[in-house]
Amino acid sequence: MKQYFITDQGKVRPHNEDAGGLFKNKADQTLSIVADGMGGHQAGDVASEMVKTYFANVWEATERIATPEEAEAWLKSHILKANTNVFQHAEQNPECRGMGTTVIVVIFMADQLSIAHIGDSRCYRYREDDLTQITDDHSLVNELVRSGQLSKQDAEYHPRKNVLMKALGTNPLVEPDVFSVAWQEGDRLIICSDGLTNKLTDQELKDYLATNESLRDIAKEMVNEANDRGGEDNITLALAEHSEAEEGDATC
């Protein structure tokens, strides 16, 4: 499998509240994570970094996961533990009150992906010239779209586009979306924060993923394009490709 991770502060924010990375367990299986933090007094970067570090540590101590069912159970259990950690930290530290983070976590197996997510960081799968968003945003505008009160086109420019219905760490309990999908030779996957998807359309993401360029080059071009269009937010993404080759690891 080829894989690449990149995070960028963007051109406007004073610091990077995104976090993420690619990590291996004891059986050399890969976990990918992206978290987009929120909260005043720089607490957003505390929340996202806490979640990233938690998943990195527990995954690196984990033995082989053999089935999607096992992966989903692992993900749900650790999302709940990470939520408790962030919520309690915010309760105990006044400067962190109200902090939280989106999170999307992917476990890669030979022919399956198991995914857990909360918030509006997204996962897309590119397969045979088709790009599919395989996560649902936990956002106000997405709820309005789903209920027929707003068109998908109008949602892109809605003034409350960034209002989340669900985030990790803002409440004592949280219910993540957890599911598995097929992962086959030639597939490409992207998980990303909204600093990317607020600047690049789904069609543009598809066009990038359809090229024969390396994942490193694709990722850097995406980040550069998002910054060229204003770069008002932090930009974070992890790319993966189902292939025999190995490529890259991570960059900041």
Question: Language-model segments: what does each one mean?
Answer:
Residues 1-252:
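PP2C/PPM-type serine/threonine phosphatase catalytic domain
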